[in-house]
Amino acid sequence: AADYPFDDMLYGDFQKFPGHWKDGKLYSMMVRCGHLGVSYNKNAISAEEAMSYSCFWKPEVKGKVGHFDWHLPSLGMMSLYDGNGAGLWDLSSGQWKKVQNTTLSLRPQVGGYFDYGGTFNSLKNGEMQAMCGIGDWITGVLEKDGAPVASVVPKEGGIQWTESYCIGKGSEKADIV
């Protein structure tokens, strides 16, 4: 840890970020992070509507709600919508069943499941008007290019993601990192 300065971290919370440290020892280094919430086309969903995951059920976007192809963020968003808050992953069997039912109730709204390229293109060309499982790591690029899209963390909460580097114990090339 002495090789890596932490005094320039964006937020103090990230200096000893849980999961990267154990017993005072650094095991991985955060490279970038962001938040997942409601990503939407501003011509189809208002900023006010986007402040709740309920906008995914808006009749006007039927068949135009996309899902990023990794299930975890989408299920986490449904769990937040169901009121599970910070316990969104630690569910009883009843809570999990409710998340499943909420997710399945969204099916008529869904227009597709997309990888990175498909997510990017379907929002850019307007094929999808809202997207579960992403955030400004995609919409920020599209906004800079003039697309009428945005991402927000809604009132029910969002999901934080991080990408981190680590050097495996016994690495023969640790000195080049």
Where are the model-predicted features located?
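Loop/turn elements at helix/coil->beta-strand transitions in domains of secreted/extracellular proteins
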Residues: V61-V65, P108-Q109, G126-Q129, G146-V149, ...
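Active-site-proximal beta-strand/loop segments in catalytic clefts of secreted hydrolases
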Residues: N41-K42, F68-W70, I134-D136, P154-K155, ...
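Beta->alpha turn/N-cap motifs
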Residues: Y116-G117, G133-I138
